[in-house]
Regions:
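Mid-to-C-terminal alpha-helical segments outside catalytic/metal-binding sites
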Residues: 1-8, 14-50, 214-219, 232-263
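Histidine-centered catalytic micro-motifs
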Residues: 2-12, 137-140, 171-172
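Active-site neighborhood of phospho(di)ester-bond hydrolases with catalytic His/Asp-centered motifs
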Residues: 2-5, 53-54, 81-82, 107, ...
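Conserved, mostly hydrophobic/aromatic
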Residues: 6, 43, 70, 98, ...
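Active-site environment of divalent metal-dependent phosphoester hydrolases
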Residues: 10-13, 58-61, 86-90, 113, ...
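A general structural detector for well-ordered alpha-helical segments in enzyme core domains, enriched
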Residues: 38-42, 66-73, 94-98, 121-125, ...
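Active-site gating/metal-coordination segments in enzymes
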Residues: 49-50, 60-144, 148-151, 202
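Catalytic pocket-lining loop regions of alpha/beta-barrel enzymes
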Residues: 104-105, 118-221
């Protein structure tokens, strides 16, 4: 079984335009058309059983629309997180609605949403997500949308669980996209989950393997950041790390099943 914990897709009407825009910003190719149908086609071809969709509310006004879309496409193959914007006046109400919609967690992107992960004004958001048992997946490290400032540095991410010990926190991109030294220093060995998305493009194999060993297979999630990377690319990297069958199963699906309450 294979669960990709970090997938992006969009409504059919805007998928092509959105991917072209993001591709120009990131100077990165994409590997699906960004629609539900083409993402499922890609998953079938790649051997991905379940994709965990991670939408981003880039504006406060987008919360409800994005979460309604996520709820409308959710099925046994696509399990969706919702998203809230920290600056929205109704952010707390929307967290409760995410739970009511049957979505599986909350995606936050500090760079797109223009906040720092340790900003005090996020306290109620973290506290409410913890109380509702909603996992949070954070973009961490570099992002081309704000190249001059890393809004989710590993050191700040590592501090969040100290205040919210029951919050399930997932740091995308090995804890810091293109900022792996600090991720290794501050996040590796913590109780924060780390997803491996985009590691095949940017993370040195020796460092990747070292981080996997030191963090532990029970806190690592297989992920791609589809459509910006593929399951084949990330699996080729993972396969170069000497893991037991149990450890690989944990990374490829077991930890995800636990977070998603599928076990």
């Amino acid at each position: 079984m294979l669960i990709d914990f970090h997938v992006h897709l969009f409504p059919d009407a805007i998928a092509e335009k959105t991917l072209e825009h993001l591709s120009r910003i990131a100077q990165s190719p994409y590997h699906t058309k960004g629609t539900v149908a083409d993402t499922l086609r890609y998953m079938d071809a790649a051997g991905v059983d379940i994709g965990v969709v991670q939408p981003i509310a880039t504006k406060p006004s987008q919360q409800k629309t994005i979460n309604n879309f996520a709820a409308s496409i959710q099925n046994e193959r696509l399990l969706c997180f919702g998203s809230v914007h920290p600056d929205a006046e109704d952010v707390m109400e929307e967290l409760y609605r995410i739970r009511e919609l049957g979505l599986h967690g909350v995606k936050l992107h500090p760079d797109y949403q223009n906040f720092y992960v340790d900003d005090p004004h996020l306290a109620m958001l973290y506290e409410t997500a913890q109380a509702l048992e909603l996992p949070i997946l954070l973009h961490t490290g570099y992002d081309p949308v704000s190249p001059e400032s890393i809004h989710g540095p590993a050191r700040a991410v590592a501090q969040v669980p100290h205040s919210y010990p029951q919050l399930t926190l997932i740091a995308a991109h090995m804890g810091g996209l293109m900022d792996y030294d600090r991720a290794e220093r501050y996040l590796v060995g913590s109780n924060v989950y780390i997803d491996i998305s985009m590691s095949s493009k940017y993370c040195d194999l020796d460092q990747f393997a070292r981080m996997v060993y030191q963090h532990g297979a029970d806190r690592i999630l297989f992920a791609t950041d589809c459509p910006w990377s593929t399951a084949g690319d990330e699996m080729r990297l993972l396969n170069q790390v000497a893991l037991s069958m149990k450890e690989k199963a944990q990374i490829c699906y077991g930890n995800a099943q636990h977070i998603l309450r599928l076990d």
